[in-house]
């Protein structure tokens, strides 16, 4: 028997290092935006989820300061005890309006929303069908639920249909779970087809709108709005920490669903309520995206400019460096392995670009992931293209 029960940690760390999977934090020394300061150097930021550039917006900052002055720095308890403020309820009403649902519920993070909701609506007698590219929080929520999990190959509707045909009748409840925008590839789920299958096989459907909220849809309502599926029966989950520039998560759906979750979801019941500052910032962000659709339009214009610049430089498509589909502001450049990805990320930094390597186990294959923002200027996009060209030669 080993003398030290913690000795395995050193061995595990060594394995992580050998696989080039080791991670460490990088300290950003500036306010969020298209230009950031890292290690004393200004870089163009292509690694942020701040799609609409709201995290550094003075109106969000002012709202957070005012809420802190009025309500304090923390909520001090769970929402069912001392942690509820009127501003929480106001935010939930605005989310429900944005998502065009009967009701909504705010969580302290998107991760907590996913694991809490999934493990509340299904359990050991039930079936979960999950896209293989789903976010970690969706996968861990499925595991926590104790339900039977079937992972279907990415966006493979025929495979999913076959599994529902074979397995659905053996279980009490069925839940299909998917990201609407897949965060590490940038492609979209086939939402209308998933809704058809859910209806046909008496299955619930949960869609994680983390990277779609504020970005997709004529009003910023996400992929549900983008695909004209508003009003359909489904569970919508999202985050306040990406395009909304704050922190927290939400679930939107029917009044009965939200009342049930408020009474049964441990990650909401037993967690301190979202801080007044984060709540106020998110509330302000929703109001801004409704009043300023030009922010969203500028984001999509930047994507169009980037695609045009990219496609005129055919060198980038040589040597197997074929990019992902252009369905969202997330563009991926697949690479051979973690070592190559780390080298490319470092070379980009030397060219004034911050777009670090994405490696296993976060993803199956290594890549550079580019995230566009509405606050990027055309010159920023041109500098990125120039840097990519230099690397491809």
UniProtKB/Swiss-Prot annotation:
GO BP field: biotin biosynthetic process
Sequence positions that bind pyridoxal 5'-phosphate: 110-111, 183, 208-211, 239-242
InterPro entries: Aminotrans_II_pyridoxalP_BS, Aminotransferase_I/II_large, AON_synthase_class-II, AONS_Archaea/Proteobacteria, PyrdxlP-dep_Trfase, PyrdxlP-dep_Trfase_major, PyrdxlP-dep_Trfase_small
Keywords in alphabetical order: Biotin biosynthesis, Pyridoxal phosphate, Transferase
Positions annotated to bind substrate: 23, 135, 362
Catalytic activity: 6-carboxyhexanoyl-[ACP] + L-alanine + H(+) = (8S)-8-amino-7-oxononanoate + holo-[ACP] + CO2
Cofactor or coenzyme needed: pyridoxal 5'-phosphate
Molecular function via GO: 8-amino-7-oxononanoate synthase activity; pyridoxal phosphate binding
SUPFAM superfamilies xref list: PLP-dependent transferases
EC numbers, comma separated: 2.3.1.47
Top-level taxon of origin: Bacteria
Pathway annotation: Cofactor biosynthesis; biotin biosynthesis
Modified-residue entries (N6-(pyridoxal phosphate)lysine), positions: 242
Top class in the EC scheme: transferase
Assembly, per entry: Homodimer.
Alphabetical list of PANTHER family matching this protein: 8-AMINO-7-OXONONANOATE SYNTHASE, CLASS II AMINOTRANSFERASE/8-AMINO-7-OXONONANOATE SYNTHASE
Role this protein plays: Catalyzes the decarboxylative condensation of pimeloyl-[acyl-carrier protein] and L-alanine to produce 8-amino-7-oxononanoate (AON), [acyl-carrier protein], and carbon dioxide.
Family designation: Belongs to the class-II pyridoxal-phosphate-dependent aminotransferase family. BioF subfamily.
Protein name per Swiss-Prot or TrEMBL: Putative 8-amino-7-oxononanoate synthase
Gene name per UniProt: bioF
């Amino acid at each position: 028997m080993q003398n030290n029960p913690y000795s395995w940690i050193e061995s595990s760390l060594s394995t992580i290092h050998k696989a080039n999977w080791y991670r460490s934090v990088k300290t950003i020394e500036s306010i969020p935006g298209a230009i950031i300061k890292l290690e004393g150097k200004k870089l163009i930021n292509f690694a942020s989820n701040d799609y609409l550039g709201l995290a550094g917006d003075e109106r969000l900052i002012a709202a957070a300061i005012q809420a802190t002055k009025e309500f304090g720095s923390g909520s001090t308890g769970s929402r069912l005890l001392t942690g509820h403020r009127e501003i929480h309820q106001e935010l939930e009403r605005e989310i429900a309006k944005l998502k065009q649902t009967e009701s909504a519920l705010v969580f302290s993070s998107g991760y907590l929303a996913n694991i809490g909701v999934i493990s509340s609506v299904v359990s050991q007698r039930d079936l979960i069908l999950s896209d293989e590219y789903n976010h970690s929080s969706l996968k861990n929520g499925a595991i926590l639920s104790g339900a039977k999990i079937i992972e279907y190959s990415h966006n493979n509707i025929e495979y999913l249909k076959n599994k529902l045909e074979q397995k659905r009748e053996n279980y009490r409840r069925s839940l299909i779970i998917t990201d609407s925008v897949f965060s590490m590839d940038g492609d979209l789920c086939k939402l209308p087809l998933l809704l058809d299958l859910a209806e046909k096989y008496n299955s619930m459907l949960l869609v994680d709108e983390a990277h779609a909220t504020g970005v997709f849809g004529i009003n910023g309502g996400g992929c549900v709005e983008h695909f004209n599926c508003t009003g359909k029966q489904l569970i919508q989950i999202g985050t306040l920490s990406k395009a909304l520039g704050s922190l927290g998560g939400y679930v939107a759906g029917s009044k009965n669903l939200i009342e049930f979750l408020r009474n049964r979801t441990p990650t909401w019941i037993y967690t301190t309520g979202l801080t007044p500052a984060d709540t106020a910032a998110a509330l302000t962000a929703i109001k801004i995206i409704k009043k300023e659709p030009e922010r969203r339009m500028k984001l999509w214009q930047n994507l169009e400019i980037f695609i045009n610049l990219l496609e005129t430089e055919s060198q980038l498509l040589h040597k197997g460096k074929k990019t992902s589909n252009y369905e969202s502001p997330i563009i991926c450049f697949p690479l051979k392995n973690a070592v190559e990805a780390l080298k490319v990320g470092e070379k980009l930094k030397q060219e004034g670009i911050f777009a670090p390597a994405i490696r296993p186990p976060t993803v199956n294959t290594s890549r550079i992931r580019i995230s566009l923002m509405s606050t990027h200027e055309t010159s920023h996009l041109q500098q990125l293209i120039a840097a990519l060209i230099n690397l491809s030669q």
